C-alpha cells in the first residue's frame, strides 16, 4: 500500500512537472528534483521503517544533486532547449551564471553527503570516498565555471559521484556487518 501510494505520488509529481512546470520556469529542474528524489523515500518507507533524519538527508542529497547534474547537460545542449522553447536556466542565463548555480548546488550536495555519515552511522570507507569524490565534484564545478572543462565532463562525473556515494554506503555497511 505504501509503495503504490508512493509511486502514485511520483507519477502525479512527474505529470505536474512535465506538463506545467517544465515549459514555464527556468527553475523547473529544482522543482522537478523532488519527484526525482522521491524514490529514496519510497524505498525507505517500503522497508517498513519510519521516515527519519537519515531518509530525509538521502532525499536531500538526490534533490540537491539533480539541478547541477541537469544544468550541465542543459549547457551542453542549450541550442536544443532553445529550439524546443524550454526555459532551462542556461537558455535564460549565461553559461558563467549557470555555472555559479551549479557550484552552489554542488557544494550543498557535498556538504549533505558528509552530514549523512554521522546520521546513518557510516564509517571511514564512506567518509573517505564521500570526501575524495566530493572534492573532485567541486574541482569539476570550478573547471566548468572557469571554462577548463566541457559541461559534459561535469555531467558524466556527477553520475559517477552519486553512484559512488550510494555504493560506498553499501560497502561501508557490509564491511561493518562482516567485522562485528
For the regions a protein language model found, what residue spans apply to each?
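Solvent-exposed interhelical
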Residues: 64-114, 120
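Helix-coil boundary and interhelical linker segments in multi-pass alpha-helical membrane proteins
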Residues: 5, 40-62, 112-125, 170-180
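Small-residue-rich segments of transmembrane alpha-helices in multi-pass membrane proteins
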Residues: 30-47, 155-169
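Interfacial loop-to-transmembrane junctions
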Residues: 138-164
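Membrane-helix interface "capping/anchor" motifs
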Residues: 19-29, 146
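Single conserved hydrophobic/aromatic residue that forms the stacking wall/gate
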Residues: 1-11
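Transmembrane alpha-helical segments that form the membrane-embedded catalytic/substrate-channel core
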Residues: 12-18, 60-78, 110, 133-144
